[in-house]
Regions:
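Membrane-interface helix-loop junctions and terminal tails of multi-pass membrane proteins
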Residues: 1-120
């Protein structure tokens, strides 16, 4: 479970973290941007994974303290599912909290995609 159990704050933490990650990936993956008819090249070629890694690190350092920053539904759901099949003594998979790291990142990713499409 999270270090700080506040459903509303944890949901928005996951939403914001995923929003930032997806929005950054969209800009990194698109090596040029057209603004008022002028094409601006900013792609960095083979180093594209480096800024994504830095973005994930920054998200972890800023938003990771409260929830552990799933920022990907599979990162939480897969281990939680396996944990319920392979339980450990005196531990529970905490399904009452499981919707936050699933729904928060999905909403954040959709909002990032919508905003990117509006801006581009």
């Amino acid at each position: 479970g999270p270090a700080i159990r506040n459903y509303k704050n944890n949901f928005f933490s996951e939403l914001i973290g995923t929003f930032i990650l997806v929005f950054a990936i969209f800009f990194i993956a698109k090596p040029n941007l057209e603004i008022q008819g002028e094409v601006i090249n900013f792609g960095i070629g083979a180093l594209d994974a480096l800024p994504v890694g830095i973005v994930v690190w920054v998200i972890g350092m800023t938003l990771g303290g409260t929830t552990g920053f799933a920022i990907n539904p599979a990162r939480d759901f897969g281990p939680r599912l396996m944990y319920s099949f392979l339980p450990r003594k005196n531990k529970k998979p905490d399904w009452s909290y499981s919707w936050i790291p699933i729904v928060g990142p999905i909403v954040g990713g959709v909002l990032a995609g919508l905003l990117f499409n509006v801006l581009i």
